[in-house]
């Protein structure tokens, strides 16, 4: 494993609460916490996975940018992060590009499926807006001079709900991509069960999550996961390396019990025990 962590912190001007909220967007009118996060990935034909994150965290008057790269190849995980000179991905028509000098990564995702947008939460504790910019894409990434190509996925998330008030005890998320089909799912449990599942651009209101995979899809299909490999299995607090100490103290308590388990699996859509495609799924379970 190789890791780097550099720090770039921004301090807001100190304003009274009334002035602060009057100058902020609707996101910050309810909370002093805000997160905007990009998630991008690519999985090769052989199941090697590359996951990239970029975003901004704001907590009170403290704000910082961050980016990280998680690579799984041949059973080995490599994790590198930076919170200095962080560039955000650029969305232009049917392409997303991202380049990070500190991380030595440059990538492009070309759209192969239409965007999905949902407001997952809009309540007294705040908002969660989710946009799946590219449920399936043709992705090419250069990492430390190595070319990695395959089917990829791009989403972004914006929320202003503090970690202690997230509306779930267990979160399930995943995406399955093949040359013929794609599938995206989000499921919450523990604080009011919710789920959102799409297959090939159509929402699946009758579908369910069974053993962490979508079932009861249109046409009687279900997703079969096999040969899972751990990409990340850790307490979320371990991700705070390099985060400003002031920020860490503010959010560490609410993250103390949060755990993430991310896997890459061989995956197939199955109808009546017959596989109609074959691809790769990235999926995770987060508990708190």
Question: Which residues fall in each region the model found?
Answer:
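Targeting-peptide/extracellular-domain and disordered-appendage signature
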Residues: 1-288
């Amino acid at each position: 494993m190789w890791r780097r962590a550099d720090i770039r912190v921004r301090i807001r001007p100190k304003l009274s609460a009334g002035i602060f909220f009057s100058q902020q967007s609707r996101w910050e009118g309810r909370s002093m916490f805000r997160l905007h996060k990009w998630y991008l990935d690519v999985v090769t034909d052989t199941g090697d996975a590359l996951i990239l994150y970029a975003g901004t965290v704001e907590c009170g008057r403290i704000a910082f940018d961050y980016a990280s790269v998680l690579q799984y190849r041949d059973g080995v995980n490599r994790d590198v992060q930076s919170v200095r000179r962080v560039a955000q991905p650029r969305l232009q028509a049917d392409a997303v590009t991202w380049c990070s000098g500190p991380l030595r990564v440059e990538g492009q995702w070309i759209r192969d499926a239409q965007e999905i947008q949902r407001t997952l939460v809009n309540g007294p504790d705040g908002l969660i807006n989710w946009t799946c910019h590219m449920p399936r894409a043709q992705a090419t990434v250069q990492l430390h001079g190595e070319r990695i190509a395959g089917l990829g996925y791009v989403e972004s998330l914006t929320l202003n709900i503090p970690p202690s008030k997230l509306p779930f005890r267990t979160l399930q998320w995943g995406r399955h991509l093949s040359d013929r089909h794609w599938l995206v799912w989000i499921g919450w449990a523990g604080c009011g069960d919710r789920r959102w599942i799409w297959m090939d651009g159509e929402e699946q209101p009758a579908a369910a999550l069974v053993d962490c995979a979508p079932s009861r899809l249109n046409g009687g299909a279900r997703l079969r996961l096999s040969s899972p490999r751990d990409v990340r299995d850790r307490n979320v607090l371990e991700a705070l390396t390099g985060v400003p100490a002031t920020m860490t103290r503010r959010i560490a308590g609410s993250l103390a019990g949060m755990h993430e388990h991310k896997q890459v699996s061989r995956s197939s859509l199955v109808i009546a025990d017959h596989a109609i495609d074959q691809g790769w799924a990235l999926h995770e379970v987060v508990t708190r």
